[in-house]
Amino acid sequence: FLIIHDKHAAVIDPGGDLTYTPLTLELMKYIRLQSLDYVIASHQDPDIIASMPRWLVHTNATVVASKLWARFLPHLTSAFMSDRIRSDFSDRLIELPDQGQNIPFGDTVIKAVPAHFLHSVGNFQFYDPISKILFSGDMGASMVDDAQSPVTDFDAHIPSMRGFHQRYMCSKKVMRLWANMVRDMDVDMIVPQHGKSFVGKAMINRFLDWIGNLPCGVDLLTQDDYDYAGLINSVKVD
């Protein structure tokens, strides 16, 4: 996702090497790469930020990520790419504290809001107070063919979301805490990294009501999921 405000620009969750070239070609239709202020990462997954070294080499952008990942992100950089980066990595990194913070963006801000354990232990979402869009990362993600259009039939959309959230999200408690936070925000659109967006207060509230009551992650685990004896008994040695 690309946010542009006056002469400022930020890209959110730009992905890995597979997406770097096509993404930069699209970005150059709207901005000069050298004018990019930020490369923002919701969490540490390869499909989120593995292309970081290339952004550091080819732009002057600052990387924004959770403080938990500050010591891990340099491991994405090969020795070859490290030699090409023009400055020390720590000088081009904003480490977000757990409670989040405002990221300066011209005469406004991008708000980093906490979304920890949804699914990463150091996870953030990003809110644009001008457009009132919440870029929600993996929260609200869906497995659909047509991701360009927003959700219009929420009940029909549930099957494309349920399995992903039950596997990747930590617990119903965390999702409910997150939903309560979003209800206190002035959000007109929730845009996940994958799948359809939720547009308008009514559709957003439908999603928040559903996600805040969905058992997932550790809620679904039993002792059968940690059955060492069953594993041993199932192993056959010829």
Where are these regions (language model features)?
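Metallo-beta-lactamase
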Residues: 109, 116-192, 196-201, 214
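C-terminal regulatory/interaction regions
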Residues: 200-238
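Short catalytic-loop micro-motif centered on adjacent basic/acidic residues
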Residues: 10-13, 37-41, 112
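Active-site environment of divalent metal-dependent phosphoester hydrolases
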Residues: 19, 44-49, 70-73, 99-101, ...
